[in-house]
């Protein structure tokens, strides 16, 4: 499998999201994604990309892109993730270790900063085309995006 890094323009996403602080817990991440997906189904919204972010130290956010009219309700907040330039890499976690991919993209971005292709690096996020736990094809097409400033 080829793992290739590229800089591209990511579209704006209108998302329903839940955020919290605490230690890394994959079971909690999955439960929060399920909570947002259940809310979207109950509200009658069509869903798109599933986005997982770490906006701060030990701070986590799960978001699902929604299409349709909705308002925040309880812990679920409606947000707009703006269109931005990102460094992107698509890979299959069953073939290539995510630790290797994250290390590789970090080094690749360090060199892009040195050769002045980019000015700064922002937050990392994982973007899926659907539910990565229930759909193996979605899991095999994991995309890691890193917000960059040119």
Language-model segments: which ranges?
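A solvent-exposed interaction/effector surface
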Residues: 1-150
């Amino acid at each position: 499998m080829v793992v290739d890094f590229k800089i591209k323009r990511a579209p704006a996403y209108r998302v329903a999201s839940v955020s919290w602080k605490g230690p890394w817990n994959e079971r909690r991440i999955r439960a929060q994604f399920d909570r947002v997906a259940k809310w979207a189904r109950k509200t009658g919204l069509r869903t798109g990309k599933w986005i997982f972010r770490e906006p701060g130290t030990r701070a986590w956010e799960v978001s699902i892109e929604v299409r349709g009219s909705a308002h925040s309700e309880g812990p679920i907040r409606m947000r707009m993730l703006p269109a931005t330039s990102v460094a992107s890499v698509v890979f299959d976690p069953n073939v290539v270790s995510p630790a290797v991919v994250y290390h590789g993209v970090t080094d690749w971005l360090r060199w892009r900063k040195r050769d002045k292709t980019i000015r700064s690096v922002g937050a990392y996020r994982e973007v899926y085309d659907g539910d990565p736990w229930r759909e193996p094809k979605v899991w095999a097409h994991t995309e890691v995006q890193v917000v960059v400033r040119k």
